[in-house]
Amino acid sequence: MIKIRRLSSVDDHFQAELDQLLSFEVSVDSEIERTVTQILHQIRTHGDRALLELTRQFDNPDIDRIEEIELPRDEWQSALMSLDKVQREALEQAASRIRAYHEKQLAQSWDYVELDGTRLGQKITALDRVGLYVPGGKAAYPSSVLMNAIPARVAGVRELIMVTPTPKGEKNPLVLAAAAICEVDRVFTIGGAQAVAALAYGTTTVPKVDKIVGPGNAYVAAAKRHVFGTVGIDMLAGPSEILVICDGKTNPDWIAMDLFSQAEHDEQAQSILLCPDKAFLDRVADSISRLIDTLPRRDVIRSSLENRGALIHVRDLEEACMIANRIAPEHLELSVDEPEQWVDSIRHAGAIFLGRYTCEALGDYCAGPNHVLPTSGTARFSSPLGVYDFQKRTSLIQVSAAGASRLGETASILAKGEGLDAHARSAESRYQ
């Protein structure tokens, strides 16, 4: 029997218990920080030489020359052609759906002209070059390639550089095939903090990028945190999360599997169910105990559910939505009748999955919306990765002679009030 936490919103100490359940701090490992700082300094100071040494040390001891870290284009094209038909069609279908969704996000430049001829506007420009980090080896995720590369391509990014480690020379054909589908420009077989550093600072072989996106381990996350400001980054993601709001009418086995789908990521992942039906919570608990041993990652799931999972009894669905906003989850399932009527009640969530048939796993792979989502409550102020993350906005201002006179007088008054006489005189010079 798995020991998953049971809470009730009617209990006097519920808020404190909920706070404890949600409390999670990404501890800063001093050894990781020290190692990452050293690696960043090595790459910044010694470039390719350090990159080759670190790649030999951590990933592939058989690499002889720095030129070997770049994969020729025909190798990833070959990986795509070598996939069996079912896998290739699944990747291509997912890519097509992701592309179609993200094309709806594409922003356009705009402007307008005032009566005196003054023109104001906003220019949308794609980033020049983006670096995509993809974990390597057997645990690689081709879906992450699609979710990160396709929005960049839709945005109009000129050059997309992918880095992925190849432990002991092992390459993941699905990842390379995904790179081919997304028309990535260059692929380098490097990983870890050294790959992040190479992308951020540039070396003779690896070009400097404007932004780095993609998931990674603790060393990659620490490196991204350190280089932020030199380059942009997507986000600092915490453990994966799912919150399910259910009215008690869904198959409890479905709900159990939905909770498992996040719990299997790692021991720190969080899976929570909110329901006004106590008997249904009992049935889900039974399903969890019965089904968990059928899964290969059952030990990870068990640890996740026992440490950070919960089945919570609530008064009604309205209260469930209030609690959901308090949690601001990465993924939120509305497994209820007429889920549309509750959407406006949800203010804070990375993604909302409506209805009993809409499992979160579809969003991870092929529904279309991005699976790179804010975690750890940051959905209160953050959004999913999208086309807008690969575009910049530049203000446009053009005033006529009449506009210079009208606006110049206003600017002069305000500038003098701030004690900035040069500002005032600059504005005045256009109309005096």
Swiss-Prot record:
What's any GO biological process attached to this entry? L-histidine biosynthetic process
Amino-acid biosynthesis keyword on record = yes
Whose protein is this, by species?
A: Nitrosomonas europaea (strain ATCC 19718 / CIP 103999 / KCTC 2705 / NBRC 14298)
Q: Which cofactor does it need?
A: Zn(2+)
Q: Where does Zn(2+) bind?
A: 262, 265, 364, 423
- Where, by residue number, does NAD(+) bind? 133, 194, 217
- InterPro entries the record matches: Ald_DH/histidinol_DH, Histidinol_DH_CS, Histidinol_DH_monofunct, Hstdl_DH
What remark does the entry make about the cofactor? Binds 1 zinc ion per subunit.
Give GO MF terms, alphabetically.
histidinol dehydrogenase activity; NAD binding; zinc ion binding
- Cross-referenced PROSITE patterns, in alphabetical order? HISOL_DEHYDROGENASE (PS00611)
Q: Which protein are we looking at? A: Histidinol dehydrogenase
Under catalytic activity, the entry for this protein gives: L-histidinol + 2 NAD(+) + H2O = L-histidine + 2 NADH + 3 H(+)
Q: Give the binding site residues for substrate.
A: 240, 262, 265, 331, 364, 418, 423
